[in-house]
């Protein structure tokens, strides 16, 4: 039997959503560059949907925004929640107009597996546990990045960057025996080293989201 030249099948993919909250493209550029500097390799090449629900200007320059994202090596596949005039621009630019439906009320799928790393993660290395928790029996060194769609458990020192709930899971946590991180992030909310030092006096801790803010709880000895 001859294999068909193409097949159309239903599937599901995780798409990152970039929310644009104001018209000023210069300010958007500055904030975007700041976020990309924190984890430069995490978003590169990943499909991205732009949420424009807060942009109500019919003459908004969507082409300029698209050019900005492309210049930062981000892959924009479409927009969502845009007014009709902007949706028309998107069509002309070859971008999909993705209907959000009830997506905003849908909880991310909880990870059902764990990725286990039985070694130190050294400077320059990046480990990503897709659709899983991440367990590290070792130290995450300065300049290293560990990322998980679920929670991150580090049975050693955390000196680099740890990003849990990368696909939007707000129930994800980060646990480290020694919390000396350059950055911690859960579902996009992040603290840099100075924030961690200002908000915590504990050496070992559990980082989690409380509402829309991060908090650190001391681990029992």
Curated annotation (Swiss-Prot):
Q: Which GO terms describe its biological process?
A: cell morphogenesis; division septum assembly; regulation of cell division; regulation of cell septum assembly
- Which Pfam family, giving just one, matches this sequence? MinC_C
Key word Cell cycle present: yes
Q: Which domain of life is it from?
A: Bacteria
Q: Keywords for this entry?
A: Cell cycle, Cell division, Septation
Q: What is known about its subunit structure?
A: Interacts with MinD and FtsZ.
Task: Please explain the role this protein plays, according to its UniProt record.
Answer: Cell division inhibitor that blocks the formation of polar Z ring septums. Rapidly oscillates between the poles of the cell to destabilize FtsZ filaments that have formed before they mature into polar Z rings. Prevents FtsZ polymerization.
HAMAP family in the cross-refs:
MinC (MF_00267)
Under what name is this protein listed? Probable septum site-determining protein MinC
Which organism encodes this protein? Shewanella woodyi (strain ATCC 51908 / MS32)
Q: What is the lineage of its organism?
A: Bacteria, Pseudomonadati, Pseudomonadota, Gammaproteobacteria, Alteromonadales
């Amino acid at each position: 039997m001859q294999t068909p030249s193409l097949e159309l099948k239903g599937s599901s993919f995780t798409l990152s959503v970039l929310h644009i909250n104001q018209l000023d493209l210069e300010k958007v550029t500055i904030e975007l560059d700041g976020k990309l500097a924190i984890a430069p390799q995490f978003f590169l090449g990943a499909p991205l949907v732009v949420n424009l629900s807060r942009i109500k200007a019919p003459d908004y320059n969507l082409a300029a925004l698209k050019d900005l994202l492309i210049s930062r090596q981000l892959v924009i596949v479409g927009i969502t929640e845009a007014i009709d005039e902007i949706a028309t621009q998107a069509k002309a630019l070859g971008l999909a107009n993705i209907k959000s439906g009830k997506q905003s009320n849908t909880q991310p799928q909880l990870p059902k597996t764990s990725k286990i790393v039985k070694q130190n993660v050294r400077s320059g290395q990046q480990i990503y546990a897709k659709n899983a928790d991440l367990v590290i029996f070792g130290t995450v060194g300065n300049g290293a990045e560990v990322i998980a769609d679920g929670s991150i458990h580090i049975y050693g020192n955390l000196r680099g960057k740890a990003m849990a709930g990368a696909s939007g899971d707000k129930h994800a946590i980060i646990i480290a025996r020694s919390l000396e991180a350059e950055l911690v992030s859960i579902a996009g909310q992040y603290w840099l080293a100075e924030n961690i030092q200002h908000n915590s006096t504990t050496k070992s801790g559990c980082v989690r989201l409380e509402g829309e803010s991060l908090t650190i709880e001391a681990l029992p000895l």
